[in-house]
Amino acid sequence: MARFAVLQLLLPLAAGLTGASFPAQIPTILEEPDTPHYAVHHTVVSASSLSESLKFYVDGLGLDIIRNYNFQGDLTTLFGTNTSVLPGYFLGDTTSVYNGTDGVIYLVEFPDAKKIPTDESDPPNTGLFLTSFWMGDKLNATLDRLDRLGMGGKPHIATFSFGSEPLATYATVRDPDGARVLLVSRPYINSIGKQRP
């Protein structure tokens, strides 16, 4: 069975709904990776301001801009929005083993998106709860960088253990639109103890 990202399947559909031509060459970020694996390809973050969110995710968290990509087609049918062009950026780690083809954030700005008010004391909402990033030994440096940028809010930090061994330190911060972001301090061990590639 082919391992296509959901967006790869949606692009031709969106183009077909409007009769628009589909690009002859799909950008690298949308191509199926050579290495067979199953993973979340990308998460879409709807930003009220692309520039502020780029500052948070790129300057603050240290993600790379993989490419600028404007999603075009019948977005009214697909997403219920009142536009046919969705400006955005694919963000991720261009040095990863999958060369930026998984674990990617697609940062977009809908012209008619509704801002959902959030408060630090609010309990979690249903639906997408947070986006998590492996930080390795860069957790403190990342939190310092966010503080210098005046972004992220007050971090909530906790260390968890597995028996007597520390497992990882976690910090939650907020992106410019209030979405929860979890920063994890140990990138080489996942929550069930398997080595990452």
UniProtKB/Swiss-Prot annotation:
Signal peptide: 1-19
This protein's name: Lactoylglutathione lyase-like protein terB
Pfam families in the record: Glyoxalase
Intrachain disulfide bonds: none
Keyword Metal-binding annotated: yes
Glycosylation sites: N82, N99, N140
Gene: terI
Consequence of gene disruption: Reduces, but does not abolish, the production of terrein.
